[in-house]
Amino acid sequence: MTHVVLFHHVAGLTPGVTALADRWRAAGHEVTAPDLFEGRTFGSVEEGFAFVQSIGGFDEVRSRALAAVTDLPEAVVYAGISMGVVAAQHVAAQRPGAVAGVFLESFVAPEHVGEWPAGAPVQIHGMERDEFFGLEDLEPAREFAAGRDDVDVFTYPGDAHLFVDSSLPSHDPDAAALVDERVLAFLATL
């Protein structure tokens, strides 16, 4: 099967992120979920963002993400949830061998993180009215996908952010189940 590197969101490597990784493992994939916050988790996006600022901002997150994959094979799928998408896109742009990308609840236009590797397919998932994804990232995601048959953008009704994390109050079980179904079908094609 496929080796996936799953970067967590701004609340840290929560039990919900671990559960997501475990579901992908149960489907036969090898999943590495680096802890970029060294064991710290947060109850809100605001608390997590304050921590990110305290360690040097997103530059430090990107540095930690690159360091986390140093000993991994090059041929991996880069996946992320929200802030983790920034890490996934950055690492894939800096390191050869990306097989594919799975971007949950975020997307960053390539001019901000580096070009996505040619030939590596991508799935992008997020809620239509999520203040971060739907109102900021959805348009750049659709622009990125335009004219490409290897990029799929999936939207879900609602406004929750971090809805795929079963350990957070924002979790939407129905939408998260559909994300899992689509991601696992995608990974099975690689």
What residues fall within each predicted segment?
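Short beta-strand immediately N-terminal to the catalytic nucleophile in serine-hydrolase-like folds
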Residues: 78-80, 104
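Short, proline-enriched alpha-helix->beta-strand connector loops that line the catalytic pocket
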Residues: 117-122, 147-150
